């Protein structure tokens, strides 16, 4: 497993991480998750992989989550986890075993999942009933963006790299502005994915200083020991954050 930090725009503190499954083969080197996850699905091994990811992520991150009650761990899910009635109870029992607050776990639902909206809505409500936070991931890549925003019960929005990249171009940036106004009006914390350049960072900071950033501009994903060193080096104090920041509509600037 590797973990990519999520950064608060206003003070550059690391407020959480996203758990990312990785495989480094001795012969073939680094294998793309798209490749080995597809193989696991074909071999009917994905259920084991799913539970391995949950258990390994929570177990590795437990010391940090226990020490910092506002630090968050994001776990990606797919169709299997949504349809598996045992997944959420298992995850809840897991965090209970480590004395972790359920709201420190962010379950990330991507718009690429092709399931009926009613099924997604039911899962979202069940996840929140266990105390987990729900993240609408990859916003802007699906075909039902607006419907998801109005029908699903979620706590965070993750803006996809495709929108972040548009900030580099004046013409495209004018189209992104109204979308950002919409997201802000929902009064939900926004995480910008795939931030890779100084320009992208500066525009986000100027217009959405209450938001969060995840991307190579700050950090790539890293193994747990490297993350430990990073947090120690930066003298991380996530306790200064009283939960996620939500936008102040009066301070909104149109990009």
Predicted region positions:
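Structural preference for long, well-ordered alpha-helical segments in enzyme cores
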Residues: 39-40, 53-61, 91, 123, ...
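Catalytic core of bacterial c-di-GMP phosphodiesterases, primarily the EAL and HD-GYP domains
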Residues: 13-17, 45-119, 194
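EAL-family c-di-GMP phosphodiesterase catalytic domain
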Residues: 9, 26, 78-83, 104-117, ...
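Active-site core of bacterial EAL-family cyclic-dinucleotide phosphodiesterase domains
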Residues: 1-39, 192, 219-222, 251-255
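Conserved long alpha-helical elements within nucleotide-processing catalytic cores of c-di-GMP signaling
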Residues: 34-38, 47, 125, 173
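Catalytic-core regions built around general acid/base machinery
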Residues: 90-97, 122-130, 174, 178
